[in-house]
Regions:
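Conserved G1/Walker A P-loop phosphate-binding module
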Residues: 1-120, 126, 133, 144-145, ...
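C-terminal-of-GTPase-core extension/linker across diverse P-loop GTPases
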Residues: 2-6, 11, 17, 145, ...
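Helix N-terminus capping/helix-initiation residues
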Residues: 45-46, 124, 187, 254
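Short, conserved glycine- and acidic-residue-centered signature motifs
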Residues: 81, 137, 221
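Glycine-rich, flexible loop segments associated with nucleotide phosphate handling
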Residues: 121-129, 210, 224
Length: 277
């Protein structure tokens, strides 16, 4: 399983990746500090596997692993190649699912940028999610148009391709209305046709709501987190609250220290453990 970690610049994406993999990717307060994707492979925590290993003492224990890819931050216009858009979209296409890191904290020392990377704007989770959604959808529209073109030419020699033209034409209208391919309603046969196009907005998505320490302590009282929850619920996506800064500290602790730290916070497992699982 390969998960692509995406997000606008300065939302805490690389800090979160560092905590997940301890890979030490540069994390700085300026856009595009992640230009080439950093890749880390992480073992999935599994208490059952730990128990079996303790019981039977095998020569080798091989846990399930997840590959995380820290993908370059993007800005509005990525689907047209602005910023690092082309790299961003190509890297996402190679992933099985998307982890979208959304900024849910205020910090006057960290710029919040969307389109103009020199302009600081108010924190807006809904707007941030919308920027990335639209860029993926616009890229998908171009892909769908090419599929329609190809199917129309093929249909001249084989009428079975007419169904592809119909399906992709309906999907194009859906995408042009600002909807993701994930939310397009169709039967299994049509879903198989669409799946073959490997569309970006068809990929499963998990929202990692990045909070500050105060917000993480009671995420459901955080107004930004509530916005992310509501948007995720509309498409049946999962939301995991994290505090990237805190998770980076936790990642440096050994097993017993980590447990004590989490106990002090009053939580059973870190946001990263939930994300990796």
């Amino acid at each position: 399983m390969k998960l692509g970690i995406v997000g606008l610049p300065n939302v805490g994406k690389s800090t979160l990746f560092n905590a997940i993999t301890n890979a030490g990717a540069e994390s700085a307060n300026y856009p595009f500090c992640t230009i080439d994707p950093n890749v880390g492979v992480v073992a999935v925590p599994d208490h059952r596997l730990d128990a079996l290993t303790e019981m039977y003492h095998p020569k080798k224990t091989t846990p399930a692993v997840v590959e995380f890819v820290d993908i370059a931050g993007l800005v509005k216009g990525a689907s047209k190649g602005q910023g690092l858009g082309n790299k961003f979209l190509a890297n996402i296409r190679e992933c099985d699912a998307i982890v979208h890191v959304v900024r849910c904290f205020d910090d006057e020392n960290i710029m919040h940028v969307v389109a103009d990377t020199s302009t600081n704007v108010p924190v807006d989770p809904a707007g941030d999610i919308g920027v990335i959604d639209i860029e993926l959808i616009m890229a998908d529209v171009e892909m769908v148009e090419r599929r329609i073109d190809k199917a129309q030419k093929a249909a001249k020699g084989d009428k079975k391709y007419l169904r592809e033209v119909e399906v992709f034409s309906a999907l194009k209208d859906w995408l042009n209305d600002g909807n993701s391919a994930r939310s397009f309603d169709c039967d299994e046969d049509d879903a198989a046709i669409i799946a073959a196009a490997e569309l970006l907005s068809l990929k499963p998505i998990i929202y990692a709501a990045n909070l500050d320490e105060e917000g993480f302590a009671d995420c459901h009282a955080n107004a930004y987190y509530k916005v992310v929850e509501e948007l995720a619920a509309k498409e049946g996506a999962q939301v995991i609250p994290v505090c990237a800064k805190l998770e980076a500290e936790i990642a440096e602790l050994d097993g017993e220290e980590k447990k004590m730290f989490l106990d002090d916070l009053g939580i059973a497992e870190s946001g990263l453990d939930r994300l990796i699982k």
